[in-house]
Regions:
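Short, solvent-exposed coil/turn segments
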Residues: 3-5, 37-39, 48, 63-67, ...
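Acidic di-acidic motifs
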Residues: 14, 76, 139
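Vicinal oxygen chelate
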Residues: 32-33, 40-43, 72, 81-157
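Residue-level recognition of conserved beta-strand positions in structured domain cores
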Residues: 46, 55-57, 149
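Helix-adjacent hinge/juxtasegments
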Residues: 55-85
């Protein structure tokens, strides 16, 4: 079976505010439609991505800001952070883990807990290893995003 991730539904409290944020982030607006006041779907896709996000009225019963751990992959974490900050996105400083493990444990765009042995250190991974340098941010509702630098993918990816 060939399974592909297509859409992630984000819970937001204000559709127009979320739409403005994701436009500022630089995602492509694919669709903004609704047959009634009770239902409206706004669909964005990150440039070059096969997976999109969708939010709006009547889309989900989940609490606004409850989605965490959405990863956006970049080839140059410092350049991506700089560009997003220039667009007005509040992005954390770049960091890496002392043990070189994949980063996880975030809420609202920032760390709230870590896996055993994780130690968050400032800056890019010293050897520039793929999958090892991160920055975080959140949308206006607190849905948490992670920028992850990947310059060389794992085999089969």
């Amino acid at each position: 079976v060939d399974l592909k991730l297509e859409v992630i539904v984000l819970p937001v409290s204000d559709t127009e505010r979320a739409k403005a944020f994701y436009e500022k982030l630089g995602l492509r607006l694919d669709l903004d439609t609704g047959p009634s006041d009770e239902f409206r779907g706004v669909h964005f896709t990150p440039p070059g991505s096969g997976c999109s996000i969708m939010f709006g009225e009547g889309m989900t019963a989940a609490a606004p800001g409850s989605v965490q751990g959405l990863y956006l992959i970049v080839s140059d974490i410092e350049a991506a952070r700089r560009e997003l900050r220039e667009r007005g996105i509040d992005v954390s400083d770049v960091f890496h883990d002392a043990g070189g493990v994949l980063f996880h444990g975030h809420e609202g765009g920032d760390v709230t807990h870590r896996a055993p042995g994780q130690q968050r250190l400032a800056g890019r991974h010293p050897q520039g290893n793929s999958y090892s340098s991160f920055a975080t941010f959140a949308d206006p509702d607190g849905n948490g995003w992670v920028l992850q630098e990947i310059t060389e993918r794992f085999p089969g990816r």
